[in-house]
Amino acid sequence: MAKPTKKPPLPPGVDADILADLMKWAKAAGADSAEAFYVHGESLSVAQRLGKREKLEGSEGRDLRLRAFVGKCSASVSSTDFAPKALRTLVERAVDMARAVPEDPYAGLAPAELLATNWPELDLDDKRRPPSARTLLALAAEAEDAARSVKGVTNSEGAEASWSRSTMMLVTSNGFSGGYRRGGYSLSCAVLAGEGTAMERDYEWSSAVHFDDLMAPAKVGRNAGRFAVGRLNPKKVSNARVPVVYDRRLAGGMLGHLAGAINGRGVARGTSFLKDRMGQQIFAKGIRIVDNPHRQRGLGSRPFDGEGLPTKRRAVIDDGVLTTWLLDLASARQLKLAPTGNGSQGSPSNFYLEKGKLSPDALIADIKSGLYITDLIGFGVNGVTGDYSRGASGFWIENGKKAWPVSGLTIAGNLKDMFLNLTPANDLQFKSSTNAPTVRIEGMTIAGS
């Protein structure tokens, strides 16, 4: 059970009183209201290729963004200079700019009664000492060595390991003050199999908030090598209309299209293909898609949103029915709805499709002829109409089994139909902020080459 806290940690390197002073200075300069967002970030990244170090990059910096409101006009400015004189100049510039821009009828801070006053502890920082470059390089080396040991791997694009930590704090002139720290680790490897023009490339990666949740480097490497070798000697296929199965490495992208379509700003502008579908069946019965900002150690977790509003778990698709938009303050006001704690810009948090009942093997067992996709190319998705067309490669399914690799295909459909004809497997993993298990979609069009 998450434990609520009322006192956010002070960001390192800055006194929280400075942010409170900014609010006072903004009011004194003529602003009706204001908000300040502070970020202190640190990162370290290393990469190696064929056993030799290729990259070592580290950074540390602070950034402050101030947004001032004069009536229904607002302006945002940012600075990395925290000297008092520079901050006062920043305030004056923000207020002057706000006076000069057109009015936005939907602009403004959240009412004080809606602001978050307590929030859960989400375990977003493992509090380890920052890893050294040598430690990260050892992770990358282990991953690449494991990949190159896979029979059939002939070359490497390298392996990369990185660490980051960010401390964020938000203060508003009407009483909100909150902050939290987020850590992150990532490891990736990409290799080639085969020779000459018959080479094939693939990869594996892992990201986590805690180091202990990162995939073992040797497994990252072995997977990358195995995936690349499995793509060798692809065949072409003829045009067809068949079931298409998306490997779970790709299936989260389908949810990305959904998140874009239910973003309140697009709905308010009338540019979403789902704009008229609230409360309707857009997936099959039994399908549930969740936005959960309170997932422990979640890569998209957040105790409050970018506008100081409380966050909570929501089933945006429940039993196949669309139940909510993802709303920040501006889009909520425009649509005359309550905000959902997805500010700013209506972005999701940990967005995932709940797992189904069948294993991936069982999901394809009754497919006489079909396509199992392991890679997608291009971005041919129209968010206004839902039309979908992308290049693809993967494996041909024959009599319920992955039979041989295929490439040079184009798959096409419309997201409205694809959503309705989607069936999830039971292999959900949380590898990013948007996740889905392997999914099967009936009746997609395939064009060979």
Identify the function of each model-found stretch.
Residues 1-302, 306-309, 318-321, 401, ...:
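Active-site bordering "gate/hinge" segments
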Residues 277-449:
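Dual-mode signal for accessory low-complexity, basic/Gly-rich regions
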